[in-house]
A protein has these predicted regions:
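Beta-strand-rich domain onsets/edges
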Residues: 2-32
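Noncatalytic modules at the cell exterior or secretory-pathway interfaces
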Residues: 79, 173-185, 305-319
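Short amphipathic beta-strand segments in non-cytosolic proteins
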Residues: 45-65, 143-147, 153-159, 269, ...
Length: 336
């Protein structure tokens, strides 16, 4: 108990120690929040909890006693979306709108619904920086050649940044014909790639056929992730070359073919939008998640109209558990 009030169970274990300061080091700071963001039912002397989201729930990670015009939570680190709450002895009662907490500056910004609406296109339900296969793609290159050893090759596309969707379509600038095409993974990538296909015209839906070529062998040493997996029509299997460097996979068309379009799918953890799955988008307001409707994905993206300035959560009702709170920033999803 604290000042006659019951503490949340997470803080009742006397041998627990907060080690935030040890790991956060110079980024460790006290979070200071103005009491203006609290709901009216919070009074002086009440214990207030700083909470982080875990899927659609909130978990307290720090507490303080509300005494003055602001609340101070000791030993915290930013780069999160948080929310304030009280404990009624049975459950947490959320007492603020969510807010972003910046790691570098320590500033917070409320995520409050605005009257103005805006469109958002969703491509995934979990942050890409948690997906190893996505991180390994920048620096990879798609090439075309008429030499089977690719000693003289043209660059069709150089991967500069993380692919942000499942199906990525590229239109090469070069108007040439090639007998051989390939994807060569960057150093340290094990040539991770799930699928790719080449097309003779931009309007084609039927991919060119050819003999699968590439560097044999996989990290698992059992053939389960060899280069031919890139052409098994399964977006969730992938090539995983036996060494970090020099892996590649491609096609021999038999004769030179013009390439006006190609598509690729990165190695992924199945957190992109999955065609046929049922999704529901929520936004937080008035102490709860509010539904913006369910959709059956018709492709690898979803389109919604949302209130500006809100915290969002995308739920896959068909499968999977990897889901995380996010907001719209510069037109794209930003996860916290």
């Amino acid at each position: 108990r604290q000042q006659g009030k019951m503490m949340h169970p997470a803080f009742r274990k006397p041998l627990y120690q907060d080690v935030t300061a040890v790991y956060a080091d110079s980024l460790n700071r006290d979070l200071v929040v103005s009491s203006d963001i609290l709901c009216k039912e919070v009074h002086r002397g009440d214990i207030v909890y700083f909470c982080l989201s875990t899927r659609m729930d909130w978990v307290p990670i720090a507490w303080t006693v509300f005494e003055e015009d602001s609340l101070r939570f000791q030993d915290t680190e930013g780069s999160v979306i948080g929310c304030l709450a009280t404990w009624n002895g049975k459950r947490l009662v959320m007492q603020s709108e969510p807010f972003t907490y910046d790691k570098m500056s320590g500033t917070i910004a409320l995520l409050t619904p605005q009257s103005e609406k805006e469109d958002i296109t969703l491509y995934f339900k979990f942050p890409l920086f948690c997906d190893l296969g996505i991180l390994r793609m920048p620096g990879g290159v798609f090439e075309g050649s008429n030499d089977s050893q690719f000693r003289s090759a043209d660059t069709l596309y150089y991967v500069k940044q993380w692919p942000f969707r499942l199906n990525n379509t590229i239109f090469p600038e070069k108007e040439k014909s090639y007998r051989y095409v390939r994807y060569k993974g960057p150093k340290g990538s094990y040539c991770n790639i799930a699928e790719m296909a080449f097309f003779e015209d931009t309007s084609d839906t039927l991919a060119l056929k050819g003999r699968i070529i590439g560097t044999p062998g996989c990290f698992q040493k059992d053939g389960s992730h060899d280069y031919y997996k890139v052409y098994d029509s399964n977006p969730y299997t992938y090539m995983d070359y036996k060494t970090p460097d020099e892996g590649w996979v491609g096609l021999d068309f038999g004769i030179p073919r013009r390439i006006k379009k190609f598509t690729y799918i990165p190695r992924n953890s199945d957190n992109f939008i999955h065609k046929g799955d049922v999704y529901e988008l929520f936004y937080w307001h008035d102490k709860k998640w509010n539904s913006l409707g369910r959709q059956v994905a018709k492709a690898d993206s979803l389109n919604y109209v949302i209130p500006k300035g809100v915290a969002l959560f995308l739920k896959n009702h068909t499968e999977g558990k990897d889901e995380r709170i996010f907001k719209k920033t510069d037109g794209r999803q930003q996860f916290w």
